[in-house]
């Protein structure tokens, strides 16, 4: 009987030992020597300039961690696919990354419609969608164990900042010009909500179709209304076009945008007319002469590598990979989707050297931070004018 029990115990132990490496092998994208992650960028479409910077920042951080020995001895491999900012292409790119490349996680995918197209494919294979480059609420709502975001929503950026601007400068008539799509509606609704909290309402609402280049009628309408602050739901070309049109008409109204228009391209392409423009932002643009020594050194390293100055999207790319590295490290040497999720739901970190806000996640909080700050273009450079706005 004793021999029989001993035999059974030995068999059970053998199965347990055999199952341990099997559990690791069954975690897609994780081997003894490597962690494979994927991203999808627009390398051939309308926001290729942003994605080029993102790609550079991501690859820079990957090279750094690999040179330092990796994560618990595993090198990090980043596979980049081009979706051209097209949801149909995003579906194909996601299928390749999941089925052929066997990624462990999707990190830093750019675009709301493309992320929405990718998530069902990822989630069906138990693959997380981490830190997409979009401020849409759908990136963390409704709550799902496999989706996590870090970017303050357009709605919340505008809700808080429009109240702050009114209180700071005493504006009496707030108007808005926004893109006629989901992005623009989020901006408009945020402005409405913020003004309602201080017993105000939008004095004028104007829209434009995506791809528009003439904003003269919208600007004239808002000027006739007597607006003294215009909230812009615009990106690059539309921001420059609207402000430029207003200045040509001799209308020196104040303009405020969102993180979608917080880019060095505004002042580089728009010139002196862009001075005075306000925008919300969640991280500071890294100028080569930044006040921070750490940022200056980072920017110099970036420029040496890529032969161009870094920009805010370079920082976004660097940050999302850095965040993945930190959480994967906390997950420990036995990296699985479950251990990663357990680590992220207990994760928090202070502000980083780029001015990014404190981040924290939990089982019920899958957005790292929902705060933004205001910056203004002064003498051709973005300059912070507030800390992170809480109300």
What are these regions (language model features)?
Residues 1-36, 389-391:
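Short, low-complexity disordered leader/linker segments with a strong preference
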Residues 25-39, 67-76, 166-172:
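Immediate post-signal peptide segment of exported/extracytoplasmic ligand-binding proteins
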Residues 29-59, 81-88, 110-113, 177-186, ...:
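Extracytoplasmic "Venus flytrap"
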Residues 34-36, 49-56, 64, 68-140, ...:
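Beta-alpha junction/loop-to-helix N-cap segments that form part of ligand/metal-binding clefts
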Residues 42, 63, 322-330:
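Short glycine/serine- and small hydrophobic-enriched flexible loop segments
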Residues 88, 102-205, 254-279:
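Extracytoplasmic ligand/sensor domains, especially the bilobed periplasmic-binding protein
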Residues 243-317, 384, 388-390:
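Extracellular/periplasmic periplasmic-binding protein-like sensory domains
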Residues 304-314, 325-382:
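Segments of small-molecule ligand-sensing domains
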């Amino acid at each position: 009987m004793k021999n029989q029990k001993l035999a059974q115990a030995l068999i059970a132990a053998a199965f347990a030992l055999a199952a341990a490496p099997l559990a690791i092998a069954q975690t897609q994208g994780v081997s003894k020597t490597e962690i494979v992650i994927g991203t999808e960028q627009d390398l051939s479409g309308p926001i290729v300039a942003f994605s080029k910077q993102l790609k550079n920042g991501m690859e820079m951080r990957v090279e750094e961690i690999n040179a330092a020995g990796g994560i618990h001895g595993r090198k990090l491999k980043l596979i980049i696919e081009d979706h051209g900012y097209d949801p149909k292409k995003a579906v194909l790119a996601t299928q390749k990354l999941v089925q052929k490349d066997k990624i462990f996680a999707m990190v830093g995918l750019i675009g709301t419609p493309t992320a929405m197209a990718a998530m069902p494919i990822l989630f069906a294979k138990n693959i997380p969608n981490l830190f997409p480059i979009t401020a849409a609420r759908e990136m963390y709502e409704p709550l799902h164990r496999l989706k996590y975001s870090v970017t303050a929503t357009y709605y919340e950026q505008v809700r808080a900042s429009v109240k702050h601007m009114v209180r700071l400068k005493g504006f009496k008539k707030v108007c808005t010009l926004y893109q006629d799509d989901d992005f623009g509606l989020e901006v408009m609704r945020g402005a409405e909500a913020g003004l309602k909290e201080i017993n105000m309402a939008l004095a004028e609402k104007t829209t434009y179709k995506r791809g528009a280049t003439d904003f003269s009628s919208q600007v004239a309408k808002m000027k006739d209304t007597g607006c003294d602050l215009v909230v812009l739901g615009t990106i690059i070309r539309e921001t420059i076009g609207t402000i430029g049109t207003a200045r040509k008409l001799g209308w020196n109204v104040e303009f405020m945008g969102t993180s979608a228009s917080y880019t060095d391209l505004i002042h580089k392409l728009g010139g002196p007319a862009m001075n005075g423009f306000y925008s919300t932002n969640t991280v500071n643009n890294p100028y080569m002469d930044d006040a921070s020594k750490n940022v200056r050194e980072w920017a110099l390293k970036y420029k040496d590598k890529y032969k161009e100055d870094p920009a805010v999207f370079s920082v976004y790319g660097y940050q999302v990979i850095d965040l993945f590295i930190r959480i994967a490290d906390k997950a420990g040497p036995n990296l699985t989707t479950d251990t990663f999720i357990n680590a992220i739901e207990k994760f928090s970190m202070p502000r980083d050297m780029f001015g990014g806000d404190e981040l924290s996640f939990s089982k019920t909080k899958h957005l790292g931070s929902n705060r933004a700050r205001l910056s203004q273009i002064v003498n051709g450079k973005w300059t912070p004018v507030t800390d992170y706005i809480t109300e």
